[in-house]
Design a protein with these regions (language model features):
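Structured mid-domain segments that build the active-site/substrate or prosthetic-cofactor binding neighborhood
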Residues: 55-199, 203-208
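Short, glycine/acidic-rich hinge or "gate" loops at secondary-structure transitions
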Residues: 16-22, 157-170, 216-218, 232
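Conserved, charged catalytic cores of large soluble enzymes
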Residues: 4-5, 9-86
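A short linear-motif detector with a strong N-terminal bias
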Residues: 1, 5, 95-99, 222-226
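Short acidic-hydrophobic sequence patches enriched in Asp/Glu that either
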Residues: 47, 138, 219, 223
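Ordered core of a single globular domain
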Residues: 206-232
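Conserved small/polar residues in nucleotide/adenosyl-binding loops
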Residues: 1-10, 230-235
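Hydrophobic alpha-helical packing residues
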Residues: 5, 146, 150-153, 223, ...
Length: 235
């Protein structure tokens, strides 16, 4: 079935054969299933061929290294990407942001992101130079602006009544969504995330010293680490 889906997708639309982008497909690659000589190697090959023609499916490695694969290996949980290829951070059943103990498990199904606001990093560097200010001082201003926008969004959404979307908030469509129609939804928003977006790292590096991130990505990496530290919650 999956192989057939790949074949249908890479043919494109009738007529001009234009690639079909929606609905998006994500291929969950498991080396033990899709690797060389494994039972579904042919499905993997079909996926590669489809990606070469249409840029989809997106790929997630369940047997590699990193956040996505570690959650799969430890808990058997698949973290599906949202539309912009962003991923939900874990929320544990009993402990919330952090596991209560080694038996606590993360929840991803039924959760959502309330919104994303992206940093235009080259613009921030250009602004800092034009105003003769420290880059990180200007970056802090925009990071705090995004944080405040997200807080405002949480507060605004929290005042909405469950009756605005009964399927999601009253019938369990969203995680914790078993409210009465007249209840405010703020009480179930805590497991939901808000995103700080990052754009144009390569252009940032080129503006910084005229080199791409392939030639010298240190400044871009430093900025990324800085943003990650800023947005990381304290235990």
């Amino acid at each position: 079935l999956v192989g057939s889906e790949m074949c249908i997708r890479d043919r494109g639309k009738a007529g001009r054969k234009k690639p079909v982008l929606f609905p998006k497909i994500v291929f969950l690659y498991d080396e033990n299933i899709h690797g060389k000589g494994k039972i579904s190697e042919d499905v993997f090959e079909a996926g590669v061929d489809c990606s070469a023609k249409t840029m989809y499916p997106d790929w997630l490695s369940m047997s590699g290294k990193g956040y996505i694969s570690s959650m799969y290996k430890q808990y058997g949980k698949v973290i599906s990407p949202m539309g912009c290829r962003a991923f939900l951070s874990p929320w544990y059943e009993r402990g919330g942001m952090y596991p209560a103990d080694d038996k606590d498990v993360p929840v991803f199904v039924g959760r959502f992101n309330i919104g994303a606001v992206s940093l235009h990093l080259p613009m921030i560097l250009a602004k800092a130079r034009a105003e003769s200010r420290d880059f990180y001082e200007v970056l802090d201003f925009y990071l705090e602006m995004i944080r405040n926008l997200h807080i405002r969004t949480y507060d605004y959404l929290g005042q909405m009544r469950a009756s605005t979307n009964p399927l999601a908030y009253c019938e369990g469509g969203f995680y914790g969504g078993h409210l009465k129609p007249n209840e405010k939804i703020g009480k179930i928003l805590k497991p939901m995330t808000a995103s700080f977006g990052i754009t144009a790292l390569n252009e940032l590096q080129e503006l910084y010293n005229g080199k791409s991130i392939a030639e010298d990505g240190q400044f871009a990496l430093d900025v990324l680490k800085y943003c990650l530290l800023y947005t990381s919650p304290s235990p």
